[in-house]
From Swiss-Prot:
It holds the Pfam family Filament. Belongs to the intermediate filament family. This is Keratin, type I cytoskeletal 18. Expressed in all tissues examined, including epidermal keratinocytes, tongue mucosa, corneal epithelium, Meninges cells, epidermal goblet and Merkel cells, gill mucosa, basal cells of gill secondary lamellae, hepatocytes and bile canaliculi, bile duct, intestinal mucosa, blood vessel endothelial and muscle cells, interstitial cells, fibroblasts, scale-associated cells, ovary stroma and follicle, optic nerve glia, eye ciliary body, chondrocytes and kidney tubules. The lineage of its organism: Eukaryota, Metazoa, Chordata, Craniata, Vertebrata.
Length: 438
């Protein structure tokens, strides 16, 4: 009859115990213990004790990672012959001593390998751990990008300000143009009125000139009529030969009377002529003064019209230049917005790339943390197997309870630290702790 229990394995490594009982003699067997880290493995062969006859199997220890292997075996059998038993025990003790020396050497090698492995794990954690991540190489790129964004924003604001200033200047020029246009229209209306006044003045002047001509003709006619009357009077006097002697006082001389009448009429005609001439000159002076005033006003109006026309042309030129400036500024604004959008897209792509890289770094950190936990688990299991092997070599009894007690629970605490970096500074940090049994 035999009872066998075996195969209790953990993740990444395996170890098992089996106990076999025979009906004739009790036999205790410690089964093989497997443990490995990477390509390394440790195997402890079974050892059996019998009440009458004992046999101790071979024990072998091998390391695949170090490229070396050792193996030794012991076969001890007892019989009724005590001397034969003592000789076998002596030989077995020598073999055990040799195997113990080999085992201790293997333990030292394993400890050195564990030390190297821990050093590599520590270096990997220092290089790629969350607290040692160095993102300073991105600070220059981010500063340059921030500077470009700030410059683009400043240029955009400057362009908007220039456009607003140009729009305000265009509005001012439009108001000024409208006011100048109203002034021009009022001046043109005044010019039309002045032209009417000039036409009326010309008509009055022509009427006065016609009146003067009529008066001159009337004066000539009066002079001619007067001369004719004088000639007729003289002829009548010369032709009349009648001489009347009157016994009366001597009257006035007719020639003297005629001379007096002639002088009187000539004086009145001269007076009328002078008055007419003075009145004509006065009217002409008044008309000339009015005409000169109207001419000066007309010349001033023409000058003002020319000035207004020049100002209008200047304003139209400035308006065209402002329109062209506005068009160029709008084109520059569109180009700036397009360039700004392109830069923002490139920055977003860079940001997405950095975020993906950060995600990859975090996943690598998590993966290495899991690998570290796995290696730590393997190390602890190796230490447990070494302790069990030492206890077996020291001659301690091996029981099923001891094998089961070796299967102690190992709890692993995983601490995840999440940090948010802005401008190379930590703005938020969160810690998540998880415990699990190994």
């Amino acid at each position: 009859m035999s009872v066998k229990r075996s195969s209790v394995r953990g993740p990444g490594s395996g170890y098992g115990y089996s106990i076999t009982h025979n009906s004739t003699a009790p036999t205790y067997r410690a089964a093989s213990t497997y443990g490995g880290a990477g390509g390394q493995g440790t195997r402890i062969s079974s050892v059996s004790y019998s009440g009458v006859r004992s046999g101790m199997g071979g024990m072998g220890v091998g390391m695949g990672g170090s490229g070396g292997s050792m193996s030794s075996s012991i076969q001890v059998s007892t019989s009724g012959d005590t001397a034969h038993i003592m000789g076998n025990e002596k030989f077995a003790m020598q073999n055990l001593n040799d195997r113990l020396a080999s085992y201790l050497e293997m333990v030292r090698n394993l400890e050195q390998a564990n030390g190297k492995l821990e050093l590599k794990i520590r270096e990997a954690m220092e290089k790629r751990g969350p607290d040692v991540n160095d993102y300073s190489r991105y600070n220059a790129i981010l500063d340059d990008l921030r500077k470009k964004v700030f410059d683009a924003t400043t240029d955009n604001a400057r362009m908007c300000l220039q456009i607003d200033n140009a729009r305000l200047a265009a509005d001012d020029f439009r108001v000024k143009f409208e006011s100048e246009l109203s002034i021009r229209q009022s001046v043109e209306a005044d010019i039309v009125g002045l032209r009417k006044v000039i036409d009326d003045t010309n008509m009055g002047r022509m009427n006065l000139e016609s009146e003067i001509e009529a008066l001159k003709e009337e004066l000539i006619f009066l002079k001619k009529n007067h001369d004719n009357e004088v000639m007729e009077m003289r002829n009548m006097i010369s032709q009349s030969g009648v001489q009347v002697d009157v016994d009366a006082p001597k009257g006035q001389d007719l020639a003297a009377i005629m001379a007096e009448v002639r002088a009187k009429y000539e004086k009145e005609a001269l007076k009328n002529q002078e008055e007419l001439k003075a009145w004509h000159e006065t009217r002409i002076t008044e008309v000339q003064s009015v005409v000169s005033q109207n001419t000066e006003a007309l010349q001033g109006a023409h000058t003002e019209i020319n000035d207004l026309r020049r100002q209008l042309q200047t304003l139209e030129i400035e308006l065209d230049s402002q329109k062209s400036l506005k068009g160029s500024l709008e084109g520059t604004l569109r180009d700036t917005e397009m360039r700004y959008n392109m830069e923002m897209e490139s920055l977003n792509k860079i940001l997405v790339g950095l975020e993906s890289e950060l995600t990859n770094l975090r996943s690598n950190i998590q993966q290495q943390t899991q690998e570290y936990e796995h290696l730590l688990n393997i190390k602890m299991k190796l230490e447990a197997e070494i302790a069990t092997y030492r206890r077996l070599l020291d001659g301690g009894d091996f029981k099923l309870q001891d094998a089961l007690e070796d299967q102690r629970t190992v709890k692993t605490k995983v601490m995840t630290v999440t940090q948010t970096l802005v401008d190379g500074k930590v703005v938020s940090s969160s810690t998540e702790t998880k415990e699990r049994n190994l």
